[in-house]
Amino acid sequence: MSKSSIGTEPVYDARTLGKPRMFILGLQHMFAMFGATVLVPALSGLDVATTLLFAGIGTLLFHLLTKGKVPAFLGSSFAFIGGYNAVRTIGTNADGSAIYNNDLLAYACFGVAIAGLMYIILSTLFKIFGVKKVMRYFPPIVTGPIIIAIGLTLSSSAITNCRANWLIAIVAILIVIGFNMWGKGMAKIIPILLGVLGSYIFAIIIDPAERASVAAAVSSAKWFGLPIVWKNSVFHLFAGPVDSGMLWSAVLTIVPLSLATMVEHIGDICAISSTCGKNFMVDPGFHRTLLGDGLATTLASLFGAPANTTYGENTGVLALSRVYDPRVIRIAACIAIVVSFCPKFAALVSAMPTATIGGVSLVLYGMISAVGVRNVVENKVDFTNTRNVIIAALILVLAIGITYSGSIQIGVVSLSGLAVASIVGILLNAILPGKDYTFEQNDQGATSVDFKV
């Protein structure tokens, strides 16, 4: 590939860029997912190194089961944090804060492992009935607003991170925009990596406290460490006496959460399909993507790592770089595995300024929403049709409103705004009269994704 065409044309085979460039692109994806992935264990009491190890292994397993066709990275899922905390809570302090017993995390991990198996059940249904019968319920008027909502619902975390230091965040944003718009050659397709490095260095230069924090974190970390905490694993749980009541409680608390994450998985695969211009819903198919996500979650949980999920951050990187080769994602997965054995490098990345993460995330989440807009426009959705307006309006308002006001609790099931919006959108599309979309005969734009099956 000529240097002048890099960043201006889609790249489906990154081998044309050369191995050094592929490694740098993989590093960019690793940095994009790192902030959110290490936050999950921090909030749930699990281990960061174990999380990174099984984010990498889970991603490679997903790619194996999806024939290496889907450029998705599997990071740690936020959807199960409430489940982990519910299982390990043993009381409350005088101020109302929870008292946690991390020895109970192995029970929670068992519950998540069973939740991962629920994906296999849905995967089997897709295989038996075929994607054609299922995907009629996911026309562009449903998938487009859902993809838009994915980016918008993630945006609050980006803004929160930016507030830590708006100057550093703005520097990150300007670097990303500058290189993506006016960069030449390789610089044009690694704007996120350059934004992270540039704003990181800027923060260290202008902020003595940040400089001291990074130095302390890196100097105290070891060069090598084993990334598995045995006491959090399900194997350790069954190596001794097991509280069957606690085991059932963990399963009943956590497994229902998989209903929401499976709906979100479908939205994520639609987003990746729209970004790359390929119909991954048909080839390799939802039955394979669900199987890969579910087994990755079960495997991670057995060893005491958080549940895995397809990551929106990396979808944003795909949209920005226009390099869609899954090989690059697999390189990122291998880097994550290596980093999990090196606490010093993990500490260096973990010490990344919060505002830096916020700045690059703001761009990435915006790119996801822009992909949703493109999906609607290129599939020529008619917004003079009241039916379409109602469906899109409710998906967007429910997703954003519930996200900012708190999830809906139905018994032990906690439904996120995106899950509720997806369910409502699917139901309205199935129930409301006046469909103007025929699944097998979609009138698409010249550059739209062919969603026909």
Regions inferred by a protein language model and the residue ranges of each:
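Membrane-embedded alpha-helical modules
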Residues: 104-210, 333-442
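Intrinsically disordered, low-complexity non-transmembrane regions of multi-pass membrane transporters
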Residues: 1-24, 211-239, 274-278, 431-453
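N-terminal signal-anchor module of multipass membrane proteins
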Residues: 1-74, 78-102
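Interfacial segments of multi-pass membrane proteins
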Residues: 84-91, 180, 314-329, 335-340
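Membrane-embedded hairpin module used as a gating/binding unit in multi-pass transport
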Residues: 33, 199-301, 305
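Short, non-helical or kinked segments that cap or interrupt transmembrane helices
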Residues: 46-51, 68-81, 134-143, 188-194, ...
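Juxtamembrane helix-boundary/capping and inter-helix hinge elements in multi-pass membrane proteins
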Residues: 43-46, 87-103, 139-140, 274-284, ...
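Membrane-embedded helical hairpins/re-entrant loop segments and their flanking transmembrane helices
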Residues: 11-20, 40-63, 67, 253-326, ...
